[in-house]
Regions:
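Expand to "…catalyze enediolate/carbanion chemistry for C-C bond making/breaking, isomerization
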Residues: 10
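N-terminal signal peptide c-region/cleavage motif recognized by signal peptidases
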Residues: 14-19
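N-terminal secretory/targeting leader peptides
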Residues: 20-112, 121, 128-337
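Bacterial N-terminal signal peptides that target proteins for export
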Residues: 1-6
């Protein structure tokens, strides 16, 4: 039997061990036919698999198949899902500083909002809110508008007493200031609630109106830009820590700003297409002039109220809001927006 030379033996001994393949599941609540499934989540799946050289296998589960939307963050934290994409505000009170990006008037595109939110996260200002998971990226959608079943809303008086679905408690505060009655529910519940008349309307960006077929249950669409929603794609901490160094490097390389921007740009494209689809069958109402000033004053009161609540709890609400404003300015300059 031939003997190995000393050099060959040393070379074999020092070769890195081939990392074993790891299978990860990725849960989200958007429909299987949504643009997010193909352009964001499956694209991320392919990127990670390619980056890892096949050492990581990702399977994406859409449409709440691994858990309800409201449990998304908890499912990632507890290992029910290895990775989950969810809305921070679905876990009320858990992400008070992150939800500052939801406040009205901070930005007018998902790309800029996502850039600013990721910068805020990267600064370490939000570390305490995510200490029990491993965050991949954060982002926002574009401006959210008001969509109503039968009532044309063009004044604050029109909105008085209407039962309006709010995505989060922060946006509920805004609706209260506007005179509406906020009703909490995740986005997948909107279609049925509106069809049954349980709610009179709902808050959604144009992109999501089309994505959840909500244009089928609302005839009137009031464009104002009330809010933006905060999202996070995050990973079970134990699952991440169990990866090999090479596998961690692959995950890390497909995390952060690049994917925040990818998500934001996708939402901006979705808003253009969603608005076109929605207005093909619905009526657009825009808030202008003196009436707009009244709505903006109500939005400003909601912002002041939320930040005051955080400051009173000893949280840096006002400081974080000002940081977001600074990041928005940076992102607009960097992105040419």
């Amino acid at each position: 039997m031939p003997r190995l030379s000393l050099a060959a033996a040393v070379a074999l001994a020092t070769l890195p061990a081939q990392a074993a393949e790891v299978s990860l599941n990725f849960a989200h609540f958007m429909p299987a036919a949504s643009w997010q499934q193909e352009e964001l989540f499956l694209a991320w799946e392919r990127a990670v698999e390619d980056r890892s050289g096949g050492a990581i296998d990702v399977t994406v589960y859409p449409a709440q198949t691994l858990g309800k939307a409201a449990q998304g963050y908890a499912n990632a934290r507890d290992g029910i899902a290895d990775i989950a994409w969810t809305v921070q505000g679905y876990t009320a009170g858990r992400f008070p500083l992150s939800q500052i990006v939801e406040l009205p008037g901070l930005f007018d595109s998902a790309e800029v909002g996502s850039c600013a939110f990721q910068k805020l996260y990267d600064s370490g200002a939000l570390d305490a809110e995510y200490e029990d998971t491993h965050v991949l990226w954060v982002h926002t959608h574009g401006p959210g508008h008001l969509h109503t079943r039968e009532t044309a809303v063009t004044t604050l008086e029109d909105l008085e007493g209407l039962r309006i679905r709010r995505p989060t408690a922060v946006i509920g505060t805004l609706l209260e200031e506007l005179g509406a009655e906020p009703v909490g529910m995740p986005a997948p519940g909107i279609y049925e609630a509106a069809a049954r008349g349980t709610i009179d309307g709902f808050m959604l960006p144009w992109e999501a109106v089309a994505g959840f077929r909500a244009d089928e249950v609302a005839d009137h669409h009031t464009q104002f830009g009330f809010y933006a929603l905060a999202f996070v794609a995050t990973m079970n901490k134990r699952t991440y820590e169990a990866l090999s160094p090479e596998q961690k490097a692959a995950i890390d390389a497909e995390s952060g700003m690049a994917w925040a921007l990818e998500a934001g740009r996708g939402y901006d494209r979705g808003d253009v297409a969603g608005r076109e689809r929605t207005l093909a069958s619905g009526t657009l109402h825009e808030i202008d002039g003196a009436e707009r000033a009244e709505w903006e004053a109500a939005a400003a009161r909601a912002t002041e109220r939320y930040l005051a609540e955080l400051d009173a709890q000893g949280l840096p609400g006002t400081e974080t809001y000002e940081a977001v404003e600074g990041h928005v300015a940076e992102c607009r300059e960097e992105l040419g927006r």
